């Protein structure tokens, strides 16, 4: 009886406190648009600091100024180590309730897919990868395509890219990959020789480089580019049976890409063009849409294939594993505040709901730790309490404390004295399991070893042959322009790799390099004219007298 009375008293007190803090009042001579400081104090003079006389020294008790400037000093959180430059929008995913002509429940019990016409709120963040927060959106770079779906079972994050494959398959190489693509730690200049030094010694990257240096490496904007989950995931049905699955987002606006020359011309006019394009389209009611497709494959090793189906450097070809529609993604609302929503939006490949699961893709499993870890560093331990990241459903947890906690995620009626589980004193209880667990059988020796079926060049050659002649020409031009800045050993290794992919591919790169005089310019990706540009700025600039 004592415990019941105590719990009711705490609930009453908590309710009273919440009501008191949620009720906002305005003081005398205040209206809704009255400027205040963060303490709620009205600001009567926002133009002048407090001084001894109007020309005298400032006083230390300038609280409004000290609060204002101190907050300004801390306005920026650490930018993302990759995908720093981004844009985002709100919208929804609408399910078709089927996988092609079959009920989707045959393959997955995830609730958001089951009912035709069911809409799930979504937030999508697009990005470039290797450059800083305010870098141009015209650079040759993969584009991030990260989707957060606020489902009835909690959040699901699908953290993908526009290109359907990746450079590497082992997460141990990821920091080195990023270091190679990002600026030189001494000069702070992106260096094509550093990039191809790494790529030439990582033959599994040949396929991705083939896409990146073609027009597919510079999407025209975010609305007219594809999205992909890149990795093989799993769908799990009510019986606990699983299939491998890949996700694809195809823009209903069509797909458009840029050549290097076109991108440079656009960059000279507006280096925020993709962000502006997305924002303006939504403001004008021209809501971008993507048809969402899935491919499935039985959850086994597939020895009949010449590649490992879990290898993220490989495509699953449509002819073998058809794309089937499962829904559509629509973006219909711009963010109200960029920092609060787009910058603080936090995604993780480990954020899955019931009916979805991981595959044994090594890179996927490495990302699953890295993404959530970087959000805790970048945004804080309580990043999931921010509105953009918080699920749109009941949350109750015994996690507490940490930097910037501003609420306790407690269940209604929970005994506030019990912040652990199990308990018989009014604490939280475990949920009931929906469907059967998926229990894959795994056995083997623990070792450091690459997968058996690497086939690093087969699909790179197939992609080269499937390109149009225009795409092949642009690919060769861009590769030659950057490789011409590299030492001969790197050029020779890349020619060897391209030749293994397709003899014509290697031959054309070799012929192109013969026509370009070798130089040691540390040029950025896709151009050999960077040193000339630096000299041009000095030679063609206009002198001015000091003042």
Swiss-Prot record:
The keyword Cell membrane does not apply. Its main location: cytoplasm. Its EC number is 1.11.1.6. SMART domains: Catalase. It catalyses: 2 H2O2 = O2 + 2 H2O. Residues 1-59, 511-547 are annotated as: Disordered. Residues 537-547 have a biased composition (Basic and acidic residues). Keywords: Cytoplasm, Heme, Hydrogen peroxide, Iron, Metal-binding, Oxidoreductase, Peroxidase. GO terms for biological process: hydrogen peroxide catabolic process; response to hydrogen peroxide. Gene3D superfamilies: Catalase core domain. Heme binds at residue 371. The active site is at residues 83, 161. Belongs to the catalase family. This is Catalase X.
């Amino acid at each position: 009886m004592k415990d019941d009375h105590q719990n009711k008293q705490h609930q009453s007190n908590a309710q009273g406190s919440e009501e008191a803090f949620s009720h906002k009042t305005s003081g005398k001579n205040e209206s809704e648009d009255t400027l205040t400081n963060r303490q709620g104090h009205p600001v009567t003079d926002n133009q002048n600091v407090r001084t001894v006389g109007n020309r005298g020294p400032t006083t230390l008790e300038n609280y409004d100024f000290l609060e204002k400037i101190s907050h300004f000093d801390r306005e920026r959180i650490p930018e993302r180590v990759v995908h720093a430059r981004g844009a985002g929008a709100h919208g929804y995913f609408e399910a078709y309730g089927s996988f092609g002509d079959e009920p989707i429940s045959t393959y997955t019990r995830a609730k958001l897919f089951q009912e035709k016409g069911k809409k799930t709120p979504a937030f999508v963040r697009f990005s470039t990868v290797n450059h800083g927060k305010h870098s141009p959106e015209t650079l040759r770079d993969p584009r991030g395509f990260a989707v957060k779906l606020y489902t009835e079972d909690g959040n699901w994050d699908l953290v993908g890219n526009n290109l359907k494959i990746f450079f590497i398959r082992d997460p141990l190489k990821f920091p080195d990959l990023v270091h190679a693509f990002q600026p030189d730690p001494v000069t702070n200049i992106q260096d094509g020789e550093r990039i191809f030094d790494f790529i030439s010694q990582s033959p599994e990257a040949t396929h991705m480089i083939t896409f990146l240096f073609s027009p597919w490496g510079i999407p025209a904007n975010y609305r007219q580019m594809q999205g992909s989950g890149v990795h093989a995931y799993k769908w799990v049905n009510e019986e606990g049976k699983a299939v491998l699955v890949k996700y694809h987002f195809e823009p209903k606006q069509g797909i458009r890409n840029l050549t290097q020359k076109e991108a440079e011309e656009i960059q000279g006019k507006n280096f925020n063009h993709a962000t502006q394009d997305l924002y303006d389209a939504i403001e004008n009611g021209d809501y971008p849409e993507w048809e969402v497709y899935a491919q499935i494959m039985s959850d086994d090793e597939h020895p009949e294939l010449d590649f490992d189906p879990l290898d993220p450097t490989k495509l699953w070809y449509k002819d073998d594993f058809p794309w089937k529609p499962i829904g559509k993604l629509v973006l219909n609302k711009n963010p109200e505040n960029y920092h609060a929503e787009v910058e603080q939006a936090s995604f993780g490949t480990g954020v899955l709901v019931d009916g979805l699961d991981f595959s044994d893709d090594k890179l996927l499993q490495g990302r699953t730790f890295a993404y959530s870890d970087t959000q805790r560093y970048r945004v804080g331990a309580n990043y999931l309490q921010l509105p953009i990241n918080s699920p749109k459903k009941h949350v109750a947890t015994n996690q507490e404390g940490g930097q910037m906690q501003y609420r306790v995620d407690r269940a209604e009626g929970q005994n506030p004295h019990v912040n652990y589980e199990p308990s018989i004193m009014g604490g939280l209880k475990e949920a009931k399991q929906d469907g059967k667990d998926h229990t894959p059988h795994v056995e083997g020796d623990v070792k450091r070893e690459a997968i058996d079926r690497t086939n690093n060049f087969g699909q790179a050659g197939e992609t080269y042959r499937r390109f149009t002649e225009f795409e092949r020409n642009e690919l060769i031009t861009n590769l030659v322009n950057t490789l011409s800045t590299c030492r001969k050993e790197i050029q020779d290794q890349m020619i060897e790799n391209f030749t293994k992919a397709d003899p014509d591919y290697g031959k054309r790169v070799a012929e192109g390099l013969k026509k370009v005089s070798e130089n040691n310019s540390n040029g950025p990706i896709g151009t050999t004219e960077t040193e000339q540009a630096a000299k041009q700025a000095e030679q063609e600039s206009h002198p001015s007298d000091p003042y």
